[in-house]
Amino acid sequence: MGQCVTKCKNPSSTLGSKNGDRDPSSKSHGRRSASHREEQLPTCGKPGGDILVNGTKKAEAAPEACQLPTSSGDAGREPKSNAEESSLQRLEELFRRYKDEREDAILEEGMERFCNDLCVDPTEFRVLLLAWKFQAATMCKFTRKEFFDGCKAISADSIDGICARFPSLLTEAKQEDKFKDLYRFTFQFGLDSEEGQRSLHREIAIALWKLVFTQNNPPVLDQWLNFLTENPSGIKGISRDTWNMFLNFTQVIGPDLSNYSEDEAWPSLFDTFVEWEMERRKREGEGRGALSSGPEGLCPEEQT
């Protein structure tokens, strides 16, 4: 899984503010002044007569069809405010600090330095939250777009700004709908998109399940992970359906598994898990019973 299992604007940033409208032109000019301006702008004013093109008269162009050039060079785009320009500049400097020399992205080495400056371990839950907010496509990598869009999403443009967002991100992840979105993102995040993977390797899935449930560890999780760990030969990978349905499983099935039914539409791997866990508990109970039995008055260790 590499050195990291995840991928990350100053709280005072102000993005998207607008400049004021252009002051209207003065109305004190006379007709003569207006006429003079028209003569100076023949392309947008009204011509004095018909225009000859190759000796043929051509109808004069309608004044409304002409447009004056704008000082910005792009009439449809509003100029950025000073605050937004400053924020984008800080983001650019931050991105360049960690980006790869050959690729316009933050890769594993840069990610480690980024996490070190944030005072977080690359394998911890807070880094997964950043990857979620950045909508990172793969582990240990932030593209330029992911980094800029992600920092804007959390309104931070500096290391201190990102660190200041961690408490609110941790709180947000406790909301049921937000956690569901984070949970589903985590599956896609764990896939190797370059190889076109459609299922998670067993070891990656185990690590990501432990990570994503950092703040909310369901009672059945440890039993499930033990099952996956002790049955490596029978479990090659975890499909998206199995991953998504496990969240439902933790919400409706109790830790004793007594309300589980094979007749319901659960993935077949869940049937195998419940059968395996029930058998394990049966053997465990029989073992305890054997230790407690024996000749009356003798402890198990005193029997020969």
From Swiss-Prot:
Protein's GO biological process: negative regulation of cell growth; negative regulation of G1/S transition of mitotic cell cycle; negative regulation of protein neddylation; positive regulation of apoptotic process; positive regulation of protein neddylation; protein neddylation; regulation of cell cycle process; regulation of protein neddylation
InterPro entries in alphabetical order: DCN-prot (IPR014764), DCN1-like_PONY (IPR042460), PONY_dom (IPR005176)
Annotated ranges, domain DCUN1: 86-278
Subcellular location: Cell membrane; Cytoplasm; Nucleus; Cytoplasm, Perinuclear region
Segments of this protein annotated with the region Disordered: 1-87, 284-304
Molecular function terms from GO: cullin family protein binding; ubiquitin conjugating enzyme binding; ubiquitin-like protein binding
Lipid attachment in record (N-myristoyl glycine): G2
Role of this protein: Contributes to the neddylation of all cullins by transferring NEDD8 from N-terminally acetylated NEDD8-conjugating E2s enzyme to different cullin C-terminal domain-RBX complexes and may play a role in the cell cycle progression by regulating the SCF ubiquitin E3 ligase complex, after UV damage. At the cell membrane, can promote and as well inhibit cullins neddylation.
Subunit structure: Part of a complex containing DCUN1D3, CUL3 and RBX1. Interacts (via the DCUN1 domain) with the unneddylated cullins: interacts with CUL1, CUL2, CUL3, CUL4A, CUL4B and CUL5; these interactions promote the cullin neddylation and the identity of the cullin dictates the affinity of the interaction. Interacts preferentially with CUL3; this interaction triggers the relocalization of CUL3 to the cell membrane where CUL3 is neddylated. Interacts (via DCUN1 domain) with RBX1.
Domains: entry comment: The DCUN1 domain, also known as PONY domain, mediates the interaction with different cullins. The DCUN1 domain mediates the interaction with the N-terminally acetylated NEDD8-conjugating E2s enzyme leading to the NEDD8 transfer from N-terminally acetylated NEDD8-conjugating E2s enzyme to different cullin C-terminal domain-RBX complexes; the neddylation efficiency correlates with the DCUN1D5-cullin and DCUN1D5-E2 interaction affinities. This domain is also involved in CAND1-, cullins- and RBX1-binding.
Protein name: DCN1-like protein 3
Species this protein is from: Bos taurus (Bovine)
